[in-house]
Amino acid sequence: MTDHVREADDANIDDLLGDLGGTARAERAKLVEWLLEQGITPDEIRATNPPLLLATRHLVGDDGTYVSAREISENYGVDLELLQRVQRAVGLARVDDPDAVVHMRADGEAAARAQRFVELGLNPDQVVLVVRVLAEGLSHAAEAMRYTALEAIMRPGATELDIAKGSQALVSQIVPLLGPMIQDMLFMQLRHMMETEAVNAGERAAGKPLPGARQVTVAFADLVGFTQLGEVVSAEELGHLAGRLAGLARDLTAPPVWFIKTIGDAVMLVCPDPAPLLDTVLKLVEVVDTDNNFPRLRAGVASGMAVSRAGDWFGSPVNVASRVTGVARPGAVLVADSVREALGDAPEADGFQWSFAGPRRLRGIRGDVRLFRVRRGATRTGSGGAAQDDDLAGSSP
């Protein structure tokens, strides 16, 4: 390389360093030089601060090319209105002008795939709903993947160039594995859903899936004192604790019990049959109680008619179970009388021990709710088929 060319290159790099000075400027200069060698354009570098992961972003489809919604519509033969609905469903910024060149090319291609499903006869509204649910789930997965990858390459004293090279090298090996892994996991979920969610007689007669509510039992379990714990430990430690609870709940959950979601320091489980759900919740509380690294757990359970929408559940038992959890004592599994009713004439037959905790008025719930504590073991006799017990926390949620 001649001195003239080297001086020109140095001038170009200098233009991309902004107002950095000293060691930071020298470190950024090495990164920028490497990025240019990887084919990253100066405009991309200027638009990204810091540009550590630009080379890695190229590996996952960000080539710096932007297009308009109309271009995507015309290039892929997708209805413009459907495309814009799908773009909003996946979380892209709302842009009313279809000719605005603001969409990443790869993002546009992903959204355009929805057209094919509509052509196969699927309801466009349902296609948009599926896209939204996928995007929400995959956004959480992407966040976890980012943290996992960075944890693998970050080292004390690592320079910007070290991180950029390490990220590119690792992700280049990971990218070919992601598609097959996600496909396999999705198919696994579809298989289990088809196994546990058979088409019922009413749906066959109606000729369509019935959207109405159905009888289920709902449970919430949350960590006691989690909010106060946030005042004495770091946010990262809190997140790790909540993640451990979610992982433990998933480990203990098997069909017909479904792990639905986490809400901060709480987990939500649902089952068509109350007995397997009670068994799972009792196991969860028992395991947490034996782990000194966990705060104590409490759980609330209720049965009733609820409806499923986009992976979540809505209805009276959801509200009641949440409120019951809020009045349970640490280490207790507290259930509404609707659960005993759902179990039928012999609630003790499944090996549960019941104790009456009294009636309670719960915020947002009409009338008093009769509450029981459920444990494992032989049945204790008493008034109403259950012994008297005081398992209510001192204040209503």
From Swiss-Prot:
Effect on the protein of changing D222A: Loss of adenylyl cyclase activity in the catalytic fragment
Superkingdom classification of source: Bacteria
Effect after changing R132A: No change in holoenzyme activity
Stretches the record annotates as Linker: 192-206
Catalytic domain: annotated span: 211-397
Induction, as annotated: A possible member of the dormancy regulon. Induced in response to reduced oxygen tension (hypoxia). It is hoped that this regulon will give insight into the latent, or dormant phase of infection.
Keyword check for Flavoprotein: no
InterPro entries reported for this sequence: A/G_cyclase, Ad_Cy_reg, Adenylyl/Guanylyl_Cyclase_3/4, Nucleotide_cyclase
Subunit structure of this chain's protein: Homodimer.
Xref: CDD domains: Nucleotidyl_cyc_III (cd07556)
Note describing how the cofactor binds: The isolated catalytic domain prefers Mn(2+) over Mg(2+) as a cofactor.
Stated consequence of mutating N319A: Almost complete loss of adenylyl cyclase activity in the catalytic fragment
Covalent S-S links between cysteines: none
EC number(s) per entry: 4.6.1.1
GO BP annotation list: cAMP biosynthetic process; intracellular signal transduction; response to pH
Boundaries of every Guanylate cyclase domain copy: 217-325
Domain notes: Consists of 3 structural domains. The pH-responsive N-terminus inhibits the adenylyl cyclase (AC) activity of the C-terminal catalytic domain. The length of the linker segment (aa 192-206) is decisive for regulation.
Stated consequence of mutating K261A: Almost complete loss of adenylyl cyclase activity in the catalytic fragment
The protein's name in its UniProt record: pH-sensitive adenylate cyclase Rv1264
